[in-house]
Amino acid sequence: MFRFSVVCLLGVFCCAPVSASERPNVLWVIVDDMSDHFACYRDVPIETPHVDALAASGIQFNNAFVTAPVCSTCRSAFITGMYQTSIGAHHHRSGRGAIKIDLPNGIRPVPELFKEAGYYTTISAWPIRKDERLGKTDYNFRWDPGMYDGADWAKRENDQPFFAQIQLRGGKLRGGTEESTERYQKSIEERFGTRTPTSVVKLPPYYPATDVILNDWAAYFDSVRDTDRILGEILLKLKTEGDFENTIVVFMTDHGISHIRGKQYLYEEGVRVPLIIAGPGIDGGGQRDDMVEHIDITPTSLALADLEIPVWMQ
């Protein structure tokens, strides 16, 4: 299936050759623990204007899937453009044990390829920390921290393109206990003026409508609203710094909602994710129903930057 999905994803875009001075920036916005509960994707009880606007300006993929519904395995796959089982990275956080995992000979993380091509490479959380602390990596193999130049692309040389990743907490914002969820929803009330009431939550049919589950889903929808707000801030940074018009933005999550039948499960709720790609050379307002995988963003990003796709990349 990977050959089919990569062809479908690349076939959407016009990958005309570009000069070094015209090379686009590439920004991946990767969100934790969130399914496609955005207004542009489905009927939801919240508004997501920034995600919707990004989708309207680019391509919205309606059948995008991750190859693993847990973060470290998923991230190990998309940072290399390889199935996790092909590189020995399929056990969750196996790289944290006493026995370290190395990538097979010749396999390289995509930031190394961008950096080698002259790109300034960054990875950060949001807001970007002034101390240049890197954002979430969570790879199940040993990697060279030097493949990242820092956390903020604003520190690059003049006219130098950047390859950046911004890692957002997404569904994790709501916390893991009733107390942390309540604190989070109080902060939502302060920011938005109201929290999502349980009365508007429509649960999937396989969930019992108990107070615990309804409250958690209401908090989850608030985390979706918050993620949408943060995306708006990220896009504003691009516009303020004059980079928006020359930046390809990839918006995706690392797996579905953290709930039974979601995160860690191979049900659709765990592996189906939103995927939106927008930027120069990409016509807006398009939707695709082709089945694509999250590892497809890796060769696609290289192609859109007019960089060679390694033969080993899946």
Spans of model-derived segments:
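Conserved S-adenosyl-L-methionine
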Residues: Q60-V66, I123-W126, M313-Q314
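Loop/turn elements at helix/coil->beta-strand transitions in domains of secreted/extracellular proteins
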Residues: E22-L27, S57-N62, E116-T122, N158-F163, ...
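Short amphipathic alpha-helices and their capping/turn segments at secondary-structure boundaries
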Residues: S19-S21, A151-N158
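Active-site-proximal cap/lid insertion segments
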Residues: D36-I46, P69, H92, A98, ...
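Hydrophobic residues in beta-strands of the RecA-like P-loop NTPase core, especially within AAA+ ATPase
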Residues: L27-V31, T253
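N-terminal secretory signal peptides that target proteins for export/translocation
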Residues: M1-F2
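Active-site segment of extracytoplasmic enzymes that catalyze sulfate/phosphate-ester chemistry
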Residues: W28, S35-R108, L113-Y119
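Bacterial N-terminal signal peptides
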Residues: S5-A16
